[in-house]
Amino acid sequence: MVSQHDTKLLNKDVANNGALDGASLSKNQNTSSTALILEGGSYRGIFTAGVLDVLREKGVTNFESVWGTSAGAINAVSFKSKQIGRAMRIMLAFRDDPRFMSFRSLVTTGNTAGGEFMYEEIQNHLDPCDNEAFNSNPMQMYAVASDVTFGTPAYLHVKSLPNDIKMVQASASMPTVSRMVELDGHRYLDGGTTDSIP
């Protein structure tokens, strides 16, 4: 895990580097201090997914790390695995499927967003993540979740898939409509409640 203080310093370094246009970023990126920060927001994440696809298409991909909260963590998986269109495709293809997100899913699984369907069935079978590409990409990924015991943000280092997919699920487990995700003795919910923009 990374402390909140370290994250704020990283954000300050990124802000001080300037250069927001794509041409400058792709040619002059300094990977020692450049991070991609992705906020959550449920279906607002579809906009982020589109922006990430354009960044990848334009070759703006040389980030040291990607940090995502909730939907941002879900989008980060497809960005790091170099799968253009995957995050948007999933949101559009399954938006009306009651296993993806529905009251029925809440009643039958305890989660409005069907955890098993999203993080196992889609992730491994219906629109699989390229785990090999994810794991071989040197870019580091962090999913921001909320530690329920302490009420503080937790920056979970997603080192490999499929092993660490529960960290992504923890980051996107919305309070009152999702079950808490337990990892290493800690219980987590959606990172948006403690640090929506890491």
Locate predicted features:
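Patatin-like phospholipase
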Residues: M1-T69, V77-P198
